[in-house]
């Protein structure tokens, strides 16, 4: 299965995506929220009401749930459901932008910075899951605080807020540890951050904004500033790149992979993975497509194939040489910028001629060939084969160790979120 947030491949039992650090499979912190009531408190004409007025006033200030009887005077928990709606006026968003709403170790998150995390979650969802939004009847142009998420309890605003806080929590924890161990960003990323203000100013001008500040306020809400956005980018890149550096070093041994599979053999079997499931193969390809489905067009396409074949055979015929030709000639938009790579191909994934070549007996790394499918001609380069059970166990084990990595880093820093102080400004979406 894949993470619904970053699309990374994850094990079906995963609770946290090792790539982005978010909770998956719909797992959420247990929640139970009730409706916030408002009350207008005035001076009572009957002296006996004054004590009740004081109680109600204190309740309003401290987050007590108000109702029509004393049974409703219960403290509302400082959690995601503290407010039915976190939306406030632009004036209040600006006034409270520097209020600290969360801390982790020595790091602080302000309302202004939270705006960035929140709206980035919304924009990412709209961009990547627009079809899902339609099927869920989510109208992102309407008030998200009045639309219920799929669990039947949480509002979409609360869902995105929780996602935003989890994103900050994960990135900030790794950014803190990166600072402690003296990790430095790769030069290209540091240069990007150093020049971010200037680049944002250019982007703002292109989009018709008077300044980068105006652009940020329009995109992230009235309570957000350019400084808030650049702070977000610094934490995001530092935390994410440090995490990916550590994650990339996870390299379980063959014995660990075998032991992990054996320990979870029942779970893998439920997914149809056994030690007799066959192989995955990785191949690179160069696709040349005919201009039309006619005999003349196919002949012209074959002529272009011969040109590429000649260049291939005149090279040293290494994988690097193949990569060069992929970049120059491949018409497969999906793989052209990844070296023409298809990974984890299983039987049944491709058209018959393509598949027969990939799974031919005694196929070896470095083998190459030419096949024709309904898409066109494919010049193929065989990279490797791996037993499906081994590949799935290795992936699952790396993800498990990645979750342990995330949990271990998060455990080092005390987290405190004050939902009572959180406010969100509106952004016009259409």
Feature-to-residue mapping (PLM):
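Short, low-structural-confidence N-terminal segments
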Residues: 2-5, 18-158, 162, 412-430
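Residues immediately within or flanking Cys/His clusters that coordinate Zn2+
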Residues: 14
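A generic structural signal for ordered secondary structure
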Residues: 17-22, 304-312, 370
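PPIase-associated folding chaperone regions across multiple families
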Residues: 33-38, 56-96, 212-300, 327, ...
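Second-shell loop/turn segments in exported
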Residues: 99-105, 149-165, 174-185, 228, ...
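Charged, solvent-exposed helices and adjacent loops that form client-binding or oligomerization surfaces
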Residues: 123-163, 167, 179-276, 299
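Peptidyl-prolyl cis-trans isomerase
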Residues: 307-353, 383-384
């Amino acid at each position: 299965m894949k993470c619904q947030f970053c699309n990374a491949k994850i094990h079906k039992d995963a609770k946290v995506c090792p790539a982005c650090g978010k909770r998956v499979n719909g797992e959420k912190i247990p929640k139970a929220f009730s409706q916030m009531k408002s009350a207008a408190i005035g001076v009572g004409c009957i002296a006996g009401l004054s004590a009740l007025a004081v109680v109600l006033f204190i309740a309003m200030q401290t987050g007590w749930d108000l109702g029509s009887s004393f049974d409703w005077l219960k403290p509302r928990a400082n959690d995601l459901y503290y407010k039915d709606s976190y939306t406030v006026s632009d004036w209040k968003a600006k006034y409270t932008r520097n209020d600290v709403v969360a801390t982790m170790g020595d790091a602080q998150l302000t309302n202004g910075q939270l705006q960035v995390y929140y709206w980035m979650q919304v924009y990412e969802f709209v961009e990547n899951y627009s079809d899902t939004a339609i099927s869920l009847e989510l109208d992102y142009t309407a008030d998200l605080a009045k639309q219920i998420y799929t669990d039947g309890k949480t509002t979409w605003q609360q869902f995105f807020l929780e996602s935003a806080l989890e994103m900050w929590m994960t990135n900030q924890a790794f950014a803190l540890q990166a600072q402690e161990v003296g990790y430095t960003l790769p030069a290209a990323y540091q240069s990007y951050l150093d020049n971010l203000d200037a680049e944002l100013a250019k982007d703002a001008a292109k989009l018709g904004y008077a300044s980068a500040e105006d652009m940020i306020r329009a995109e992230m809400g009235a309570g957000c500033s350019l400084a808030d956005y650049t702070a977000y980018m610094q934490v995001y890149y530092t935390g994410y790149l440090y995490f990916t550096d550590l994650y990339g070093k996870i390299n379980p041994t063959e014995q660990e992979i075998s032991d992990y599979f054996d320990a979870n053999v029942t779970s893998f079997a439920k997914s149809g993975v056994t030690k007799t499931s066959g192989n995955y193969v990785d191949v690179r390809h160069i696709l040349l497509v005919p201009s039309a489905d006619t005999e003349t067009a196919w002949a012209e396409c074959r002529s272009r194939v011969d040109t590429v074949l000649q260049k291939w055979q005149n090279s040293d015929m290494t994988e690097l040489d193949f990569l060069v030709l992929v970049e120059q000639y491949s018409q497969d938009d999906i793989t052209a910028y990844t070296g023409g790579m298809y990974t984890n191909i299983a039987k049944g994934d491709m058209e018959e001629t393509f598949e027969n070549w990939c799974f031919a007996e005694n196929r070896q790394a470095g083998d190459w060939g030419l096949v024709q499918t309904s898409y066109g001609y494919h010049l193929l380069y065989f990279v490797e084969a791996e037993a499906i059970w081994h590949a799935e166990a290795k992936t699952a084990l790396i993800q498990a160790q990645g979750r342990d990595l995330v949990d271990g880093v998060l455990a080092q820093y005390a987290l405190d979120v004050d939902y009572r102080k959180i406010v969100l400004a509106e952004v016009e979406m259409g």
